[in-house]
Amino acid sequence: MLRFLISIILAATVGPAFADDMAGGSRVEVNGMKVYYEVSGGGDPLIVLHGAYMNIPSMGGIIPALAERHRVYALEFQGHGRTTDIDRPITYENLGDDVAVFMDAVGLEKADVFGYSMGANAGLQLAIRHPEKVGRLIVASAAYDIEGLQPAFRAFIPQLTVEMMLAMPFAEEYKQLAADPNGFPALVEKLIALEHEPLAWEADVKALETPVLVITGDADVATLEHSVAMFRLLGGGDMGDMGQPLPASRLAVMPATSHTAVITQTDMLISFIEPFLAGETPKGMFAQ
């Protein structure tokens, strides 16, 4: 979400958005693209999915932090970073399918998944369309329905233009990593079109059996009410301490946190993610 604002301030809030290929980077054929990815750490597999206009370096400290306990597979989406673009719209369904094909290509039968923003919605679609491939899913700054986005952002979407983005320093910096240095305008067109895609996944989310950790900032692009509604669709929101086990899915709200600040708070993210992946539940007076 919030592609435009991310593109303006990403370098300042996250760290170096562009760098040379890191050691261990590889490419694999996925649906006609050469997808760039990096593998780090050891343990159970965990796939990391970045947001729009982002790439592996611009995800900041979360990837190395997750790699302390997991075998992390971080990939770059269609037209992003070092991954090539193809003549195809960028949709959440397409991105989710790309991840499924990527998993087959690198020999991953099943993995846990962490996605941020666009990557979170792609992760939702992966779990919806390919549930057998996802163990546990963490979605940071996700939305399952267009009505759940903040009114101010929904009003801003019609104002987005390619020209607006081409005037940003980000447009020039894009060339430092891009598989096609001249491909930025085409990428922007596709991402603006993505903002206009209708989101209406309530029934699909409710049908999910995959455990999901919903993470949101308290000033995120989706309303707090929407994030709570997602948690309820996943079986959460009832009172504990009543003799019934807590649901497998969880909700975490990051205080004083805007959309673009979510991914910068590595320590807080890890404090939510690791207990969820380990299946650890705090114990109260009445055991759940």
Short names for language-model regions:
Residues 208, 214-216:
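Short beta-strand/loop motif that positions the catalytic acidic residue
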Residues 64, 218-257, 265:
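Conserved loop-alpha-helix segment in the C-terminal half of the alpha/beta-hydrolase fold
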Residues 52, 111, 115-120:
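Conserved alpha/beta-hydrolase "nucleophile elbow" surrounding the catalytic nucleophile
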Residues 121-129, 135-171:
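Flexible "cap/lid" loop of the alpha/beta hydrolase fold
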Residues 247-288:
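Catalytic active-site module of serine/aspartate enzymes centered on a nucleophile-bearing elbow/loop
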Residues 33-84:
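Conserved HGGG/HGGXW glycine-rich cap/lid loop of the alpha/beta-hydrolase fold
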Residues 40, 74-114:
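Active-site loop/oxyanion-hole signature of alpha/beta-hydrolase fold enzymes
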Residues 188-204:
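Active-site nucleophile elbow and catalytic-triad environment of alpha/beta-hydrolase enzymes
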